[in-house]
Amino acid sequence: MASISNQICSADQAICNNIASVGNRDLLSQNILSQLRNLIEGIIVFTHSANPEESFHYDKVSLAMEVVKQNGRLNFLAKFHKLIQKSASHYTFDGDTSERLMLKYYEYLLRTRKMMNVHYGLNILNNLEAFPIDQDPSLREYHERIADQINTSMVSNQQLLTPERYYIHKTRPFFVNEEIFYEVTFYRAINKATKADRVIAFTSIDITDKYSAMLTLQQDAITVIGYTMPIIIIRQWEVSIRPCEFDNLAKLLTISKKVQANSKEYRFIMNILTTESSNLLDIIDMPDNKYEVVKANATNGVVSPKLFPILDKARYIIRPKLAGHNIIRYLMLTMFNKTLKSQFDRGGCANLSALSLKYACIPFDQMPFCTSLSGHNPRYWDLVESLDTADKQHELLVRKVKNNVDHQGVLYTPVAELSQYDNLDTLIRTFNNNLYYKHRSTRKLISDKGHVFVAGYEIDTAAIVTKLKGKSSHGIQGYTEAVERWLSDSNRDIDDALKVTALKQLFCKSYVALIYGAAGTGKSTMVNHIANYFNDKQKLFLAHTNPAVDNLKRKVSAQNSVFRTISSQCYTAENTNYDVLIIDECSTVSNADLLSVLEKTSFDLLVLVGDIYQIESIQFGNWFSAISSFIPSDSIFELQTPYRTSKQSLLNFWNKVRSIDDDIAESIAQNDYSSVLNSKLFQPSANDEIILCLNYDGLYGINNVNRFMQSSNPNPVYTWRETIFKVGDPILFSETGRFTPVIYNNLKGRIKAIQQAPGWIQFDVWLDRPVSQFDVLHLNELTWISSSVVRFTVYDHPGTSDEDDDSYNTTIPFQVAYAVSIHKAQGLEYESVKIVITDANEDDVSHSIFYTAVTRARKHLKIFWTPETQQSVLNKLSKKTNTKDVHLLKARCGL
């Protein structure tokens, strides 16, 4: 039997040999993952043993693990071990997934090496730096400056903000001189919050992202690329679950309790969660004797315990695995108020141990890895961490097939892609048999013609095709002649022969017309021509986002026109019959939304407008690219003449990206479209300029770029909690409930004036829409000041985070918007466009996203990225084609 030290040394040697000998990161990661568990278990036993030369037995691991969990200096080893058990020890990953895991583990390995060297004098993982963790070099200077500020020990209390409770959205480690630091994305722990409310800060503290936390923040700044950039540093941290979240968990468990943040038992539990890096499930899963000790210590001297009756009831459900235990386990891992409230049903559910849960929660309790909770889609790794992963192969199979649909737009998954699942037919049968009989027809898996798919997706797609084919079976007699006469009589100036031809032939063979067109080819102009021909008819214009709807309003000059978002149309109760229904930006419309529109809207003629190469729908949406295979070709028109720009260099570049030519990189270099991250990002190239980012988080996400850009605004600073505002800031509204219908989601504006006093802040805001005093007559909290300028106040109520508060007036209803997301820019255009892409989000840059971004520019284009990121993005560009899905759909559904 090997000794403890031999166990460590052999695993260490295997890991180091792999790092030294293999250059391929994917293979390297897979080799290392198989050794991680051996190394960490050896170290855990080593820290507990007085004699490292003792024989290593696996039965020593569990005992040593319990000791390690209680040690604040060592408990990260238990956390690391748990992560390894739930990943490499249980699943076989492809290279890319293993690599991502290794990058996550790199932090733990660095901590392990430092701990073993400093406290035990042992040197392990000597060549860990040779593993290519591939940090973006463009961020290195920022990270070094941030690390310097974090390591500055002299911090006065005047520099610190009052501690506030925040939700931790995610943490991301970065490394400077073998030290570990964290980029933390967080937002206020209140019920009403959006992606735009997220803030990033930096710290050397290892903060859990499972629960809300009390953070003490420091407003600071760093100097990089000649600019002073504001940053936030987290100086102190402790777990601080909102009391209302315990109250809502209690309701689910049929208990009525009011937990107080200042109670002894609350503070005791928060201290355990903070100092031991543990979660509530660690307490729930304790042996009875240990749990009773913790309970006794927490409630000693407490007359009427509030928190432990909740934990007692949770243990009663979870320990014997009663019905509902998976739901309660998952909820206790994350304790997110909105999710907790969404599961509540006062009437209770007899099938879930009579807990106050919705019946809609049953599928998740039975098959959590392939279903969702009410109004909430759990993250995969949260499921792995909170639930038993044994005997879940049928669920993981379904998850794989559904991911192909939702993320790849692939309706039919080839059986060859599912080779890792043994006994495929048995797994499919197991899943289908576990479905509720009323759901089986749409949710069941089907294996046919060498492919596996979810029945409901096929049913919806076939229903859309059937409805549109029915509408396209006949056209309008005399339509072409009528249009020709209208063109002659109205002297309408249409400067594109393709548009004239399309207008004449639009409905002569079909009641459905498709208008495709590359970016800038005048699709909106074509829509306006159609609208004006049908000027005296009732017309409904739909688009997915408010900016796209606003764009239609600006472009369409015809009378009798109604404009709505897709979602508002899906929920409208009107029964107006429209002569013409026009849907813009069709690539962004999901199958489910289109089917809802077709079923709920009465119309005669249908015009579908969009570009299959621009951003696709977030949910499954294959209909727009597939429908051209099912309706008459005479009703399909493609606009080709570009009007957005006259710059031939831009046009050539757009065409190369659209068709994914081999010389995209050469075109970028020739036209100087590329730059590393530098001061040019913050120097305007035109008045009409926008910075486009892929997402909200990260050093170069939307929210932080907004902070950087705001620092160039010379007006005085107004600080509201962790956020800064200045007169002159451009803004984008994200909250609609408080000021509906005057202010709506994605409405643009600009701050004109700010007043502030303890407990409140008041804004005068110019809105990018006409507003009169009459418009705000019935809105008590909105005051009209002058032309399109309105005033409102936001309040700061102490204890808002403790209570289950759904009020709007404590939330800033807008975001500072020097930068916006690529998704929100679809359908819009700017004289100058700057795009920021870092290695943190390069994997999310699809062909449609990249093409949409670069085609927003009329004159100036600059992409800020490293050469490595550019190469990675360009190499991964590929068009999503669904010809196989179309053939299978025709064969299976008789279409």
Model-assigned labels for residue ranges:
Residues 2-203, 211:
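Extended low-complexity, intrinsically disordered and solenoidal helical-scaffold regions
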Residues 120-127, 133, 138-476:
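N-terminal accessory nucleic-acid engagement/regulatory domains that precede
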Residues 461-472, 654-657, 853-857:
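Short amphipathic C-terminal alpha-helix that caps PH/PH-like domains
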Residues 477-490:
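Conserved adenine-nucleotide phosphate-binding loops and their immediately adjacent elements
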Residues 490-511:
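N-terminal pre-P-loop "Q-motif" helix
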Residues 504, 508, 512-669:
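ASCE P-loop NTPase helicase motor core
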Residues 513-556, 609, 664-708, 717-724, ...:
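Conserved RecA-like ASCE P-loop NTPase motor core of nucleic-acid helicases/translocases
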Residues 521, 560-564, 633, 645-648, ...:
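Core RecA-like ATPase module of SF1/SF2 helicases and allied nucleic-acid translocases
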